[in-house]
Amino acid sequence: MCAYETTMVGNLRTGAAMTAYMDHKDLANEVIAQARAQEITDGVHRVLDRIASAESAAGRAAGSVQLLAATKTRDVGEILAAIDAGIRVIGENRPQEITVKADGLAKRLGERGYSLGVIDAAEADTANAAAATHIPFHLIGQLQANKIGKVLPVVDTIESVDSIELAEKIARRATMRGITVGVLLEVNESGEESKSGCAPSHAIDLAQRIGAMGGLRLQGLMTIGAHVDDERTIRAGFAHLRRTRDQILASGAEGTADCTELSMGMTHDMAYAIEEGSTIVRVGTAIFGERAFI
């Protein structure tokens, strides 16, 4: 089954669950209890400490790894608490959640002196834009073609581009809007059928073709670690992604000079990923706790 077919099957299976989930939690809610805010603050600080320790153990410079808060199923109030605690990049899995949360987040962050993604770019004056601290907004989950128009006004970067067909559709929409969208090529390093991403053997060719597209800025590669207990297997996938990134950069192909990011590592395997060269770790559970919904 190709990546597109796999994605479509997954979307059909999760569509009803998504509707039911959003009926049970108000994702636009902006007010949370102080105790909950403290839990999130503590979670952010623990993860930042883990990242610092992993950087040191790997002999990497402090601050070389960005912490992206994966905010799937988290409401606006919970996300604001994470940002107040030090989060500076957020990532959503589902375009539907972006649509529900974006306006409230942008408004509340504006009151705090932040700008969110590209949501205010068209209206922000130069002085205010320069003064605001930018909070990048990434899409880290799968994107259907019919949802591209909904996420482009908000997200800076789409980390889940896994085919030329999807890249071309995003590029077309971006060009029509007169914008450039950051993208990461998602690579299925584990080979697990349940995961999206292009085959590792196709990654270099796809990256070079995407880099040459107008309206897109190829920023790097993304993968999800193997769902196994064997450390060597997990590390092997991360190390291979790093080598692939290095080959893309060394090729000197058009549009690949900025292909520097390696988005790999989550709550359970971030230390391995950092030691293997990750520049972005995507963490949800260790910050917010276990999800009550899928």
Locate each region found by the language model:
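Short terminal hydrophobic/aromatic SLiMs and anchors at protein ends
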Residues: E5-T6
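Conserved alpha/beta-domain cores
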Residues: T19-H268, I274-E276, F288-E290
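Gly/Pro- and small hydrophobic-enriched strand-loop and loop-to-helix capping segments
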Residues: S278-I294
